[in-house]
Curated annotation (Swiss-Prot):
InterPro entries named in the record: Ribosomal_uS8, Ribosomal_uS8_CS, Ribosomal_uS8_sf
Domain of life: Bacteria
Keyword Ribosomal protein: yes
Protein name, per record: Small ribosomal subunit protein uS8
Keywords: Ribonucleoprotein, Ribosomal protein, RNA-binding, rRNA-binding
Entry annotated with the keyword Ribosomal protein: yes
GO MF annotation terms: rRNA binding; structural constituent of ribosome
Gene3D superfamilies cross-referenced by the UniProt entry: 3.30.1370.30, 3.30.1490.10
Lineage of origin: Bacteria, Bacillati, Bacillota, Bacilli, Bacillales
Family according to the record: Belongs to the universal ribosomal protein uS8 family.
Cellular component, GO, one term: ribonucleoprotein complex
Function, in words: One of the primary rRNA binding proteins, it binds directly to 16S rRNA central domain where it helps coordinate assembly of the platform of the 30S subunit.
Oligomeric form and interacting partners: Part of the 30S ribosomal subunit. Contacts proteins S5 and S12.
PROSITE patterns named among the record's database cross-references: RIBOSOMAL_S8
Length: 132
């Protein structure tokens, strides 16, 4: 079966593993998934990420992060731009998520960035997802 939206699959796997409090998950790798995983790690939403290379694209191993009492660090993930309805934002219109408590992941000409980085570099692009 052909996957029509690998980014939505990536976010759904993280959301599902987070809901049942798994420590880690493995999923097929791609360049954009690696960039999104690095953003989630840099912003403190996941503990760590590893890349396992093989003959194909490889595998990404994501280590989820929980608070001291077991509360989830990621409370929500939402795919915004979808294959059937792409959502773009100008550099002046890049959205803020929950007044800055969450992040928007934006695919720009300078790579995949958070909303804060896109505003700082004054670039717009495709709004991939919200994470809070």
């Amino acid at each position: 079966m052909v996957m029509t939206d690998p980014i939505a699959d990536f976010l759904t796997r993280i959301r599902n593993a987070n809901m049942v409090k798994h420590d880690k998950l493995e999923l097929p790798a791609s360049k954009i998934k690696k960039e999104i995983a690095e953003i989630l790690k840099r912003e403190g939403f996941i503990r760590d990420v590893e890349y396992i290379e093989d003959d194909n694209a490889g595998t990404i191993r994501v280590f989820l992060k929980y608070g001291a009492t077991g509360e989830r660090v990621i409370t929500g993930l939402k795919r915004i731009s979808k294959p059937g309805l792409r959502v773009y934002a100008k550099s002046t219109e890049v959205p803020k998520v929950l007044n800055g408590l969450g992040i928007a992941i934006v695919s720009t000409s300078q790579g995949v960035l958070t909303d804060k980085e896109a505003r700082a570099k004054q670039v717009g692009g495709e709004v991939l997802a919200y994470v809070w």
